[in-house]
Amino acid sequence: MTPLYFLNKYLKDYKVVRIGISGLSPLTHYRFGQCIKEAVGDKNVLLIASGDLSHRLKEDGPYGYKEEGPLFDHDIITAWKNSDFMRFLTFDPIFTEAAAECGLRSFQIMAGALDQKKIKPHYYSYEGPFGVGYGICGFEICGEDQTRDIGNQYKKKMQEEVKKIKEHEDDYVRLARTTIEHYVKEKVEIIPEVTKEMKRRAGVFVSIHEEGRLRGCIGTFMPVQDNIALEIVHNAISACSEDPRFDPITEEELDNLIISVDVLGEIEPVEDISTLDPHIYGIIVSHGSKRGLLLPSLEGVDTVTD
C-alpha cells in the first residue's frame, strides 16, 4: 500500500476501489481495463497500477538471482518510457515466471484503461537495492489517439500467428481442432474419419494453449478407445471442457487456440536417468497408487533434473 502513503499526503477526501488481478490472459486483463475506462466515464479518477517488478535481481536477495530478472525490469522500464503498452501483452509467460514479477497484470489493466488515449509518460525512478525491482512512472492523458487500440492490434497479431500455425497442422491436430470447435459450438461429439495411421491404439494427450498459456490438457497413459482417432476426440473434448484447472473454452476463444497432440509410444522402464532426454522422451513417475506424466519438449523443462 505504499502508493496510498504518498497519496494521503496530498489528498484527504477520496474513495478507493481496490481491484485484484487474476491468472487469466493478458488480453483479458486489458479488456478489464477497458471496462474500467467505460465505467469511469468523465469522472476525475487516478488509476494506480501497483506491483513490484522482478524479485530475482541479486544472489543475496529474498528469491536469489535469475538472468531473466534484470532483463524483465529493463524491458518494463523501456516500455514505460516509450509508452509501449503492447510490450505488456507480449511477454513470454515462461520468461516472466523465471523473473518472478508481480506487477505485469496491473500494467495490462492500466493499458486497457488508457485504450485509444494519447498519453505522455513521466518516468521518475527505478531501483533494486534488495534484489527486488521498484519503479515509478506516471502517464498523463493528453487527448484521444485512435491508433492506440492496443488490445485489438494484439488480438489481430495473435490470430494471424495462429492462422499460420493452422496451415501446417498434421492430421492428428486437425482432428483435435475440429473436435474442439464442433463441441464448443454444438455440444456434440463428432464421428471421426479413421485414417490408416489412426487405426492402431495408443495413449494420447491433447494440449491447448492460448496467448502462450496453457488453457487445457487432458490425456490417457494407456489407450481406452478402439483407435487413436477416437482417443483424440474424447481427450480433446475433455481438454476443452473438463480440465478442472480451467473454465470451459468459449466460442470467442476458438480463433486464438494453439493445439498439440502427443501420441504416446510404448512404455519402457528407465534403468539410468542419463539415458533420458527431455526433448525426446516423456516420463511416467509412479509412487504407490499415484501416477504422473511429463510430456517431452515441455516449456521450462530443459534438463532431466528439471
Give residue spans per PLM region:
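Short gly/pro-enriched beta-turn/loop segments at secondary-structure junctions
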Residues: L11-Y14, V40-N44, S50-G51, V132, ...
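Flexible, D/E/H-enriched segments
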Residues: M1-Q34, D60-D171, P248, E252, ...
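Basic nucleic-acid-binding interfaces
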Residues: K155-D306
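Short, electropositive, low-hydrophobicity segments enriched in small/polar residues
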Residues: H55-R56, F107, C137, T220-P223, ...
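A glycine-rich, aromatic-flanked flexible loop/lid motif
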Residues: S50-G51, K81-F85, I150-G151, G203-L214
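Structural signal for hydrophobic packing residues in well-ordered secondary-structure cores
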Residues: V40, W80, D84, L114-K118, ...
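Short, acidic Gly/Pro/Ser/Thr-rich loop/turn segments
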Residues: H55-R56, E144-Q146, E268, G292
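Active-site beta-strand/loop microenvironment that shapes enzyme catalytic pockets
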Residues: G20-F72, I208-I228
